[in-house]
């Protein structure tokens, strides 16, 4: 999991969804740096079925090192914003650097409503399965039609490749 914001929240949410059915490890807290990622990877044991790691950067050429350690097969980018922008010349440069984590993934998941991310994904031509989610475009593979917030839960209604469901 990478992005400017929301990495830890998404990682924890995925862990809560996957952990009951799979032997899953995750990076502790916000261990997403050159030091934190190797410490996180050490948790993988012989019985681990899934591992969820977050990767964060603050300057160019950092993500390739994290990609070599994590070697993700499925990647997710949350968003691109101004956080840690001082190390980059442009926000596009930062987006491309973050997407370096996903270069060898079998599948990448990203915000299909974010023009910058879409442009960078297209520019990099990953050649893997892409799942773009959207709250605006019903033609995206994953269309989120409704979010209902309750007192103790949130229900998300979605359509994935013509299959309608909710979580």
Where would I find each of the regions flagged by the language model?
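Phosphate-binding loop of NTP-binding sites
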Residues: 1-128
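Adenine nucleotide phosphate-binding catalytic loops in nucleotide-utilizing enzymes
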Residues: 92, 127-167
């Amino acid at each position: 999991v990478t992005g400017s914001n929301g990495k830890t929240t998404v990682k924890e949410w995925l862990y809560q969804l996957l952990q009951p059915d799979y032997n899953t490890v995750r990076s502790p807290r916000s261990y997403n740096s050159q030091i934190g990622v190797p410490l996180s990877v050490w948790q993988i044991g012989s019985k681990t079925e899934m591992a969820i790691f977050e990767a964060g950067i603050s300057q160019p050429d950092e993500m390739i090192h994290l990609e070599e350690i994590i070697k993700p097969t499925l990647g997710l980018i949350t968003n691109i914003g101004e956080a840690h922008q001082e190390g980059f010349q442009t926000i596009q440069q930062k987006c491309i650097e973050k997407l370096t984590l996903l270069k060898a993934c079998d599948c990448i998941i990203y915000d299909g409503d974010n023009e910058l991310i879409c442009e960078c994904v297209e520019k990099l031509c990953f050649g893997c399965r892409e799942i773009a989610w959207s709250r605006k475009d019903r033609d995206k593979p994953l269309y989120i039609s409704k979010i209902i917030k309750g007192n103790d839960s949130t229900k998300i209604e979605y359509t994935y490749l013509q299959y309608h469901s909710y979580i």
